[in-house]
Amino acid sequence: MEKVPITIRGFAALEQELKHRQQVERPRIIQAIAEARALGDLSENAEYHAAKEAQSLNEGRVLELESLISRAEVIDVAKLSGSKVKFGATVQLIDEDTEEEKTYQIVGEPEADVRSGRVSITSPVARALIGKGVGDTVEVSTPGGGKSYEIVGISFSG
């Protein structure tokens, strides 16, 4: 079973989502199925079919979350240090074309969210940054073409 690296914050979010799906969503969906069944003929009962589909999606996500949680390798980023980019690092970059500053934290796949500045360790950006230090320039291949960034800061905080 392949371990999945994840931060403490990311692991807590997975546990919270699992708890919500099991304790809130599951009972709500079961109630919706019961109410739809009470309406009669199930073959043409849109409410019943919608509730069953919601149940299927919810249970699928529950299984996925349980698998991720069982395979998680929780890493306390606050205990990490160093001068090179690695899992958990928060990296400040300057786009060499636009001079725009960007900040990314390198996290596990389940917790990645580019809009929040968290990129997956398997992403092109993270792969280009791993092992590099402040002052290094990295080339990143993106769907819109190549980008050059200079690393101007590396920090580790939870």
Curated annotation (Swiss-Prot):
Keyword DNA-binding applies: yes
Q: Which UniProt keywords apply?
A: DNA-binding, Transcription, Transcription regulation
Which Gene Ontology BP terms does the record give?
A: DNA-templated transcription elongation; regulation of DNA-templated transcription elongation
One matching Pfam family? GreA_GreB_N
Entry's Gene Ontology molecular function annotations: DNA binding; RNA polymerase binding
Please tell me whether the keyword Chloroplast is annotated for this protein.
no
Q: Which family does it belong to?
A: Belongs to the GreA/GreB family.
This molecule's function is given as: Necessary for efficient RNA polymerase transcription elongation past template-encoded arresting sites. The arresting sites in DNA have the property of trapping a certain fraction of elongating RNA polymerases that pass through, resulting in locked ternary complexes. Cleavage of the nascent transcript by cleavage factors such as GreA or GreB allows the resumption of elongation from the new 3'terminus. GreA releases sequences of 2 to 3 nucleotides.
Entries under HAMAP family matching the protein: GreA_GreB
| Protein name per Swiss-Prot or TrEMBL | Transcription elongation factor GreA
Organism in which the protein naturally occurs: Methylobacterium nodulans (strain LMG 21967 / CNCM I-2342 / ORS 2060)
